[in-house]
Curated annotation (Swiss-Prot):
The lineage of its organism: Eukaryota, Metazoa, Chordata, Craniata, Vertebrata. The gene is Il1b. PROSITE patterns: INTERLEUKIN_1. This is Interleukin-1 beta. Induction: By LPS. Keywords: Cytokine, Cytoplasm, Inflammatory response, Lysosome, Mitogen, Pyrogen, Secreted.
Length: 269
């Protein structure tokens, strides 16, 4: 018959009359002063097992007694001194979860704010001034206004109007105006001391975006059945056309005979 080898490590003497109590249903409750009182409400306190320094002979029964004693302790009923509240969960969350910083490569240079772009609303329109002149792409980077009819009506450009961030206002809607199918956007810059309208080439991977640079932003203002486009970079300067035929579209300050009122014709995507 196989024999159980003797344990080689030091172990306290549990071979006493009280050891048998651990094998009873309510054994540990009958023992007094054997274990330290503990409170689960305090994370720094716990059950402590003290090992005696006495050197005695060990047996398999002593090892089993220790194991059974620990198992019995797990089953001891404990009355909690407080009612568990939601805020108590924060104590455990700090051990379970680890905070990590949120990193983003894009920061707003003006306001030093974190910018997270999302898909923006975009509609397509044809624009005509109040004299019904259409806007066409004359040179690679120049728009002109002229009357079209017949087959050449398809020469007029289609604008991709993106609704972007801008100054809060009840009667002004900030938009960016790009040419559909081309990487060109209308922008306003200062040239020779005068606010100037131009077509600017952009990276299609970066544009359009919700937070457009201010030179690209126009405040769309509805006046009865017409619309005006005021430069956000240069207030009181508007996208304008001349009374004359076949003249470039420019940025004007609503003086003289400049035309700043347009009609919009919606185009399906």
């Amino acid at each position: 018959m196989a024999t159980v080898p003797e344990l080689n490590c030091e172990m306290p003497p549990f071979d006493s009359d009280e050891n048998d109590l651990f094998f009873e249903v309510d054994g540990p409750q009958k023992m007094k002063g054997c274990f330290q009182t503990f409170d689960l409400g305090c994370p720094d306190e716990s059950i402590q097992l003290q090992i005696s320094q006495q050197h005695i002979n060990k047996s398999f029964r002593q090892a089993v007694s220790l194991i059974v004693a620990v198992e019995k302790l797990w089953q001891l009923p404990v009355s909690f001194p407080w009612t568990f509240q939601d805020e108590d969960m924060s104590t455990f969350f700090s051990f379970i979860f680890e905070e990590e910083p949120i990193l983003c490569d894009s920061w707003d240079d003006d306001d030093n704010l974190l910018v997270c772009d999302v898909p923006i609303r975009q509609l397509h329109y044809r624009l005509r001034d109040e004299q019904q002149k259409s806007l066409v792409l004359s040179d690679p980077y120049e728009l002109k206004a002229l009357h079209l009819n017949g087959q050449n009506i398809n020469q007029q450009v289609i604008f991709s109007m993106s609704f972007v961030q801008g100054e809060p206002s009840n009667d002004k809607i900030p938009v960016a105006l790009g040419l559909k199918g081309k990487n060109l956007y209308l922008s306003c810059v200062m040239k020779d001391g005068t606010p100037t309208l131009q077509l600017e080439s952009v990276d299609p991977k970066q544009y359009p975006k919700k937070k457009m640079e201010k030179r690209f932003v126009f405040n769309k203002i509805e006046v009865k059945s017409k619309v005006e486009f005021e430069s956000a970079e240069f207030p009181n300067w508007y996208i304008s056309t001349s009374q004359a035929e076949h003249k470039p579209v420019f940025l004007g300050n609503n003086s003289g005979q400049d035309i700043i009122d347009f009609t919009m014709e919606s185009v399906s995507s």
